[in-house]
């Protein structure tokens, strides 16, 4: 069981909220996740219910359909993301791919196009969780929006170099930067700057 766990909490399954207005799809998705060891803490049939359940249960992840009654998935995702409750994976039909950019702007961390299999779903979940942790960690380090954007840009470039030059995965590269900052009692921004300087890539002017 590799999908729902992390090194730190290997025995604890991820807690998932599912928001999907089609009952059969919602049931299939819940069964699929339970078989992989995830815990389903709530099931919502519309966007408003999804927001309410997210605030109530504080899940580790929200899987949200884009098109839902009462309140669409993008609007609901925007509120959940703005409150930093949990990372969000959005589900969209092939014909709705134009909505993916809107979903990303709303704060979704990953998306899947229906129909999908469990082999598609697990990587999307892990990507969403990883990105959410990065953003949360970076926001805890810097106060202003402009500083956050600058720091994220530097960290993204440093991660790219670590992936290219040292063969790290994206999550491993971020963990390396985060751990280096903690070990040296400095900021992730400073570590990213050192990585860029050391690997010979000039900083932006």
Curated annotation (Swiss-Prot):
Keywords: Acetylation, Cytoplasm, Phosphoprotein, Stress response, Transcription, Transcription antitermination, Transcription regulation, Two-component regulatory system. It holds the Pfam family ANTAR. One of its GO terms (cellular component) is plasma membrane. CDD domains: REC_PdtaR-like (cd19932). Residues 135-196 form the ANTAR domain. The modification 4-aspartylphosphate is found at residue 65. One of its GO terms (biological process) is transcription antitermination. GO terms for molecular function: anion binding; RNA binding. It comes from the Bacteria. It is found in: Cytoplasm. Residues 15-129 form the Response regulatory domain. The NO arm of the pathway is further controlled by sequestration of PdtaR by PPE1-5', controlled by the Rip1 intramembrane protease. PPE1-5' directly inhibits PdtaR and derepresses PdtaR targets, which are usually repressed by the PdtaR/PdtaS cascade. Phosphorylated and activated by PdtaS. The modification N-acetylthreonine is found at residue 2. Contains a C-terminal ANTAR domain, which is a RNA binding domain. Monomer. Dimer; when bound to its cognate DNA. Member of the two-component regulatory system PdtaR/PdtaS. This two-component system plays an essential role in mycobacterial adaptation to poor nutrient conditions. PdtaR probably acts at the level of transcriptional antitermination rather than transcriptional initiation. In addition, the PdtaR/PdtaS two-component system controls copper and nitric oxide (NO) resistance downstream of the intramembrane protease Rip1. This coupled Rip1/PdtaS/PdtaR circuit controls NO resistance and acute lung infection in mice by relieving PdtaR/PdtaS-mediated repression of isonitrile chalkophore biosynthesis. Two signals are required to fully inactivate the PdtaR/PdtaS system and mediate NO resistance: a cytoplasmic inhibitory signal through the PdtaS kinase mediated by direct sensing of NO and the production of PPE1-5', an NO-induced small RNA, to sequester PdtaR. This is Transcriptional regulatory protein PdtaR. The gene is pdtaR.
